[in-house]
């Protein structure tokens, strides 16, 4: 089965990101495909490379990045939600006069059209969070 995932919550204030990660990992290990992972609303906070959790806590951003590396996942961050929360790549930093970027290199910023395409291409769109 081909899945698309939508994550609407940040990495440390809600269990949605952890649940989505565990779902994705289990699905991929069982041979299913994930067409795209789309981070929306507060879920865009899963993409910042500046997250630094305590050593005894899980690093959900790195977990997502490692899963993306292992399975060549398309990890898309909503541009509007990212801008509102200060998540920028080089293009957005340049367009908005920012002097730094903070998106993890395994993620990319794009628009809601990517979510629509994922919903069309996948057999199921699974949404995590409110």
UniProtKB/Swiss-Prot annotation:
EC assignment: 2.8.1.-
InterPro entries the record matches: DsrEFH-like, Sulphur_relay_DsrE/F-like, Sulphur_relay_TusD/DsrE
Subcellular location(s) per record: Cytoplasm
Any single Gene Ontology cellular-component annotation: sulfurtransferase complex
Active site: 78
Pfam families hit by this protein: DsrE
One Gene Ontology MF term: sulfur carrier activity
GO aspect biological process, one term: sulfur oxidation
Key words of the record: Cytoplasm, Transferase
Superkingdom of the source species: Bacteria
Function: Not known. Could be involved in the oxidation of intracellular sulfur.
Matches recorded under NCBIfam families: PRK00207.1, sulf_tusD_dsrE
UniProt record similarity statement: Belongs to the DsrE/TusD family.
Protein name per its UniProtKB record: Putative sulfurtransferase DsrE
Taxonomic classification: Bacteria, Pseudomonadati, Pseudomonadota, Gammaproteobacteria, Chromatiales
This protein's encoding gene: dsrE
């Amino acid at each position: 089965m081909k899945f698309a995932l939508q994550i609407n919550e940040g990495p440390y204030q809600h269990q949605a990101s952890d649940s989505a990660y565990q779902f994705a990992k289990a699905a991929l290990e069982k041979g299913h495909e994930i067409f795209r992972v789309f981070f929306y609303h507060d879920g865009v906070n899963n993409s910042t490379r500046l997250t630094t959790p305590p050593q005894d806590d899980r690093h959900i951003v790195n977990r997502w990045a490692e899963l993306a590396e292992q399975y060549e996942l398309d990890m898309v961050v909503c541009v509007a939600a990212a801008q509102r929360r200060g998540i920028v790549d080089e293009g957005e930093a340049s367009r908005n006069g920012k002097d730094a970027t903070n998106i993890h290199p395994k993620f990319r910023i794009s628009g809601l059209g990517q979510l629509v395409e994922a919903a069309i291409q996948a057999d199921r769109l699974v949404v995590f969070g409110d």
